[in-house]
């Protein structure tokens, strides 16, 4: 899984015709960033100083993330081998990617 800058990277790459995103959805934690922290002793207040402009257009990605073109659900096989890479290589050898 990825989030933050990873969300941004996947979102940008999906705009290219030759890119096929394989895996699981990103985490969707890109809308607010550059957090500052104020320490009050017993607690801390953390707040963002940047906000993605897409939030104003109702197109924020909080809790949505970026959906892959080909979803590969997580499984225990991921502990043993790189399932995502294996699928990508399979698609390349089949010639079925963009």
Pin down the residues of each PLM region.
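C-terminal "post-core" interaction segments
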Residues: 1-98
């Amino acid at each position: 899984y990825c989030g933050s800058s990873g969300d941004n990277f996947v979102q940008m790459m999906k705009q290219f015709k030759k890119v096929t995103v394989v895996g699981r959805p990103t985490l969707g934690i890109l809308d607010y960033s550059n957090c500052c922290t104020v320490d009050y002793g017993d607690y801390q207040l953390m707040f963002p100083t940047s906000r993605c402009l897409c939030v104003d257009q109702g197109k924020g990605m909080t809790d949505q993330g970026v959906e892959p073109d080909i979803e590969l659900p997580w499984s225990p096989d991921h502990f043993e081998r790189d399932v995502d890479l294996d699928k990508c290589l399979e698609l390349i050898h089949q010639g079925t990617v963009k």
